[in-house]
């Protein structure tokens, strides 16, 4: 193993000089610096650039506090490697694969795998037309998720992306019992902490591995932590032959960290200040998140939309890789409709009669049609009032409002805030409920009875409680 010396430290960027008679470390190799010569006080760097004359530029995965010029740097000869396998379930890791959950130390002889890999070859890929039931009505009806597919949850600040991800983890773990990998990329540490203890209390943690590189960490860690989580998921897919769920919260922070690293490396910025390699970095991550003949990875990714601008390069680049998009809309949160999923903007390649069935497809398209017509009539209602509408239009508006409210429901993970028990609604019940509303079977019930309920029977029961 070759060794060099630190010649410059600029925040998270460390320049290291190797003597010319040694071979330079490869790009993406992990380098280690021992502060005060102690193994416990090590800092891991990743090679990013070769500057010439035996000098390389690296990005630190941890704080560079305490590093000085002249300190020895050792080339490990390989990329950052993290623990994989069944022992990772129930544990919490950082970007380097070190446990951070205060439980018993992780076995030193555990199998490890490098975080930099090639995407599966074209002939290894597999596709599936099987629907993944989430128990969330608006998703299952209008933008269903495919097993082994890629889903993006798009939304601005505070519209409910993380809560929706937490509910999906809860529902899929409770109902399907599959293995999950949760990757927190540049999000709030408090949310990660809450999620860990909630999963521990519900027993879901036993089938989940968690990886965090949160807001307070250097950009190198935030950029690479998504690869750490993906590496753990890939092992379950390729070696164990499992169907894995990979949750990433938040893909935008991955892009943001890449932008910071790019600026630190002195690259010329591209549109809106993003890194020129944005599409390449996103492609390298997303192409590895796929299903093969051995197993599948179904990924659900929260994607923050800066200033609610969907044309921003970060969310726009992610769009191209997704099978389904769930768009969260701020106007719906203002109306108290949760989850605030926009039923007209959300889409899925799985909403086709040959995949979901004729009845489901017809009900979904009719729901979209009635909501679109209601949206067109809203201007007339706002200016002239309901009295100017024809009788047919009044009936349509009434049903559309019932449909809009029925698309909302209480979440299990939000019970501590709302005081209302959450509901899991099977797809068949969802389709039946909306079909009955569209047929006018519940035109006599007040609109408010449909807000935040589960099955259609819950709406009928709520109407009785409203003394209707």
Swiss-Prot record:
The EC number(s) this enzyme carries: 7.1.2.2
InterPro entries, alphabetized: AAA+_ATPase, ATP-synt_VA_C, ATP_synth_F1_bsu, ATPase_a/bsu_AS, ATPase_alpha/beta_chains, ATPase_F1/V1/A1_a/bsu_N, ATPase_F1/V1/A1_a/bsu_N_sf, ATPase_F1/V1/A1_a/bsu_nucl-bd
SMART domains, alphabetized: AAA (SM00382)
Chain positions recorded as ATP binding sites: 155-162
Keywords in alphabetical order: ATP synthesis, ATP-binding, Cell membrane, CF(1), Hydrogen ion transport, Ion transport, Membrane, Nucleotide-binding, Translocase, Transport
UniProt enzyme class: translocase
Membrane topology: Peripheral membrane protein
One Pfam family cited in the UniProt record for this chain: ATP-synt_ab_N
Chief location: membrane
HAMAP family given in the database record: ATP_synth_beta_bact
Protein name: ATP synthase subunit beta
Gene this protein is translated from: atpD
């Amino acid at each position: 193993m070759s060794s060099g010396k630190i010649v410059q430290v600029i925040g998270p960027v460390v320049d290291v000089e190797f003597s010319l008679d040694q071979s330079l470390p490869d790009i993406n190799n992990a380098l280690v610096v021992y502060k005060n010569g102690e193994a416990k006080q090590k800092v891991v760097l990743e090679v990013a650039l070769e500057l010439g004359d035996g000098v390389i530029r690296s990005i630190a995965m941890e704080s560079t506090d305490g590093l000085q010029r002249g300190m020895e740097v050792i080339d490990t000869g390989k990329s950052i490697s993290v623990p994989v396998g069944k022992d990772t379930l129930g544990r919490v890791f950082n970007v380097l694969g070190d446990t951070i959950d205060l439980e018993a130390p992780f076995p030193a002889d555990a199998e490890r795998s490098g975080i930099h890999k090639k995407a599966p070859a074209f002939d290894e890929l597999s596709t599936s037309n099987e629907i993944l039931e989430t128990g969330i009505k608006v998703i299952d009806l209008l933008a269903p998720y495919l097993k082994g597919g890629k889903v993006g949850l798009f939304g601005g600040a505070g519209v409910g992306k993380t809560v929706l991800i937490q509910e999906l983890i809860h529902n899929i773990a409770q109902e399907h019992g599959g293995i999950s990998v949760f990757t927190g990329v540049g999000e709030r540490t408090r949310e990660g902490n809450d999620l860990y203890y909630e999963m521990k209390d519900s027993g879901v943690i036993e089938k989940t591995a968690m990886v965090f590189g949160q807001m307070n960490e250097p950009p190198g860690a935030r950029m690479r932590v998504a690869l750490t989580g993906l590496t753990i998921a890939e092992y379950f897919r390729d070696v164990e032959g499992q169907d894995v769920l990979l949750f990433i919260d938040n893909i935008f922070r991955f892009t943001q960290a890449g932008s910071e690293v790019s600026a630190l490396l002195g690259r010329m910025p591209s549109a809106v200040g993003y890194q020129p390699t944005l599409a390449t970095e996103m492609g390298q991550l997303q192409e590895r998140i796929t299903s093969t003949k051995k197993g599948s990875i179904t990924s659900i990714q929260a994607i923050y939309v800066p200033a609610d601008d969907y044309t921003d390069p970060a969310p726009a680049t992610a769009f191209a890789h997704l099978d389904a998009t769930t768009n969260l809309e701020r106007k719906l949160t203002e109306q108290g409709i949760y989850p605030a999923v926009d039923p007209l903007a959300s889409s899925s390649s799985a909403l086709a009669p040959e995949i979901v069935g004729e009845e489901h497809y017809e009900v979904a398209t009719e729901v979209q049609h009635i909501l679109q017509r209601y949206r067109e009539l809203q201007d007339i209602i706002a200016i002239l009032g309901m009295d100017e509408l024809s009788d047919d239009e009044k009936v349509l508006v009434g049903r559309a409002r019932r449909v809009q409210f029925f698309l909302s429901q209480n979440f299990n993970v939000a019970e501590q805030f709302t005081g209302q028990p959450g509901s899991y609604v099977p797809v068949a019940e969802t389709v039946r409920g909306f079909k009955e509303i569209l047929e006018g079977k519940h035109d006599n019930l007040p609109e408010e009875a449909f807000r935040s309920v589960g099955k259609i029977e819950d709406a009928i029961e709520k109407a009785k409680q409203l003394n209707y």
